[in-house]
Structure formats: structure tokens, C-alpha cells
């Protein structure tokens, strides 16, 4: 029987990513804002355009394109369904990692499989299935780093020093590589390093483990981001462009942090209890509504554990550790540190999805400790089941933007009436850079209005490049569909006036563009030098 259980478990772990790919085909094609803005464009900008165009994807033009390289080539040459299946397969690799994380805390395979399955089908994770968003694509690296860190915390940590140091370094390396692919994942990597400081070893050994993990994280970050940071620094003046530009002072971005602070909590109390607030008001942390009760449930259990620890300490007049094992301390401290960094810098829910995947494992650990050492297992089991059932019944998946399937992921038909080579000044508030790769390679695109303001240096460079083109157009998504964009035509000084042009609306051309079956009419209007 045990042999059959082993084989069935192994089959489930191996087959799950393949099955997850088929599940993605029933969710429809991804057509989210980020895809239309930069996921498809950025690899083209680096590999084909050689960074000649200026900010077509707004500030996201400068993101590390390494994670999107496979998507770009696949979307250009494969069917949309094949692309989505491949994306979901990679996302499904988190399942076996979650299983092995759960196995650190339970000997029951069925419980570990259940925790992994619930985690990968949680609201945030499942909303991104088959989507090119990087939160779930980098999750296998972040979760893999956590798993290696947990292995380093096993009892042999008190003996085999070289093995443990190697595991700690590997944990940092894998997690750091994931953070380099998507910088918003760095709270997980920092927390992985810090968590080694709380295990029950002499301080010097804990420090050595944290140092080894930190060195591994730096190497991993350099492997995935180093090339791009160097490219940004040498060509554009900052390795983190456009962020932290008050430090790096690149002339190609405003001298500020250039971060999105709209979703940050106000004050310490809001930050500490943010899971409860975003559960009641999902738009605090996401542009769409969603519901996932596991995060506030986990915080509630953690608060009860703290209250219990304080009460026991006061009664016995001696400190009693909340968590008995190094693995428990490691994963709980990692969770808390990740959350605190995230809520202070980002507070965007989808950046926390790898932690959401872990919540069912964490709930099992924390609920067990809540009732320890009395061991009333029926009560603990009932509480855990109640949380899981409540989460499943109330779960609401975030609609990131889906469409029916088309043969090709993206279709753009460039009208023959546009004279090439031409320059296009991109305006408006909508994402449209995905259309740029379908234009002739000798055309020039420059964003003069968007979510980042062109600096004087950027304006000067655009003006210089425009001199080489006799035919110049304004480029935007149908302005009549967006009143704020349509108002540009009636402004006394519209954005293109800065570059010495007036618009001729009589010669406007609609460019048929489509993500899946969703059409997006991109318009060009000729500009005349004033």
C-alpha cells in the first residue's frame, strides 16, 4: 500500500503541470493591460529594435525583458492556445514545490497534496493561470528558495555545516534569480536571508547561514538582472530606471522614486491589519475585485498565537517559544518579513501571490501550534477545515482581462496608406505598444505622454530623431473611446506642440489591432510641422 501511495503521489506531482495547462485553456486568452503595454513589446525593443524607440511602453519600457523573451517568440510563431498552455505549465511547477514544502511539516502525503492544490488554486494564483503576468511565473523560483531554506533548517543543521551552508546559499541563489526576473519579488528574497537568523543555532552559525544565503541571492540577482542593470546604467544612466531616480539621477526620468503609491496603507495600524481591509475593500490592493480569505485568516491565527505566548509567559514568568522547530520559525518569520516589506513598498496584491500559495501550509502550522501542547486535534482540525471551506465558498477570482481564443495571440494589420519610413508620437492613457513590432523596422516610435513625463533630455532626443523623418504621425488608441484622450485635440497646447507639430484630423487612419478576439482600434493622424 505504501509503495502504491508513493507511486500515485509521484504521478500527481509529475502530471499536475500538464493538467494545469489544460485548465488554462478553459479560462480564455490573456488580454491584460500589462500584456498590451510591455510584456510583448519589451523583448522586441531589446532584441529587434535595439532600444532605438523611446518609451513606447511608458515607464515599463525599462523593465527586465528576460522573463518575457519566451512569450515574445512563442506569440509570434505559435497558436494562442499553445502559448497559454506553455505559460500554465510553468506556473504549474509551483505545485510539486508546494507539496515538498508541506511535507516538511506533515508526514501525510494527502495533506501535503491538498495544501499544494489549494494554494495553486487560490484566488490570486488562479486568476493568473495562462497569463503572462510574472507573479506566478517567478513563483517556482521564490518557493524553491523557501524549500531549500527549509531543508537547511532540518536537524542535520546542527552537524553537517558544509551541507547546510550549501543549502542556504542555494536558497538565496534560486530566490535571487526569481527576484531578478521581476524586481517586485525581492521582499521574498530579503526575507529568505533574514529568516536564517531565527533558527536555534549559535549566533555565529546563524550569521554564517544568512551571509551564505545573501551571497547566493546576490549571485542569483546578477545572473538574471545583472546584464539588464548594466545595460540600463550604461545606456540610460541608472541600473533601476526609472525607479529610485532621486538616487541615480538619470536624465531620462524625473528625479523622484517614480513608484506607484496609490495602494499603500495610511499609518501603522492600516499596514498591520491591511489583509482585513483589502478583504472588505479589494480595490485597495488591486484594480479589480477579488476575494481570498486565507490571508486575513492567517493573520488572525498569528495574532492569537502572540496573545497566547504573552499569556503563557506572564503565567509562567518565563518565555516559551511559540514555534517548536526551526522549520516553523523559518517559514513564519519569512512570511512576516515578506509582508512587512511588501506593505511598506508595494501593497499591490498580486505581488504577494507566492505567499498566498503558501497560506494553507502556514495555516496548518499555525493552527497546530495554537492548540499545542494540549493536542485537542479534533478542535484544531475543525477550525482548519472551517477556514478552508469559508475560503473556497467565498473565493472570487480577479478578472485580469480575458478574451475568447483566436488563432494568433496578437493580430495587427498596418494599412498600406501609411507612408514609411515614418515617425509616430504616442499619446493617450491606454496601452498600445504591442502594435509597434508589426510596423516596419525603420519606423520610429516615441512616447510623449503616458505614466511617466518626458524629461528635457528625452524631449531633446526625440526632437533630434524626428529630424530624420519626413512623415510624422500621432499614434493612439481610438481617442473617441476615452474622453480624457479626445480632449487633447481641443487643448490650446497639445503634447505634440512641444515638438513643433499640429495635427491634421482629416487624414486619420484606423489600424485594426486585436488581442485574441478583442479589437482595439489604434489610430494615426498625420502631423504637420508648424
Task: State where each predicted segment sits.
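Extracytoplasmic catalytic/substrate-binding loops of multi-pass membrane glycan-assembly enzymes
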Residues: 27-42, 51-71, 78-81, 235-243, ...
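Membrane-lumen/periplasm interface segments of specific transmembrane helices
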Residues: 211-282
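Perimembrane helix-loop-helix junctions
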Residues: 1-3, 156, 188-221, 361
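Membrane-embedded, lumen/periplasm-facing catalytic core of multi-pass transferases
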Residues: 39, 384-453
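Hydrophobic, aromatic-rich transmembrane alpha-helices
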Residues: 94-102, 277-324
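Short acidic/glycine- and proline-prone juxtamembrane loop motifs at membrane-interface regions
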Residues: 124-138
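Transmembrane-helix motifs of polytopic, lipid-linked glycan transferases
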Residues: 73, 82-107, 144-148, 305-311
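Transmembrane-helix signature of polytopic, membrane-embedded enzymes
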Residues: 93, 98-123, 140, 159-162, ...
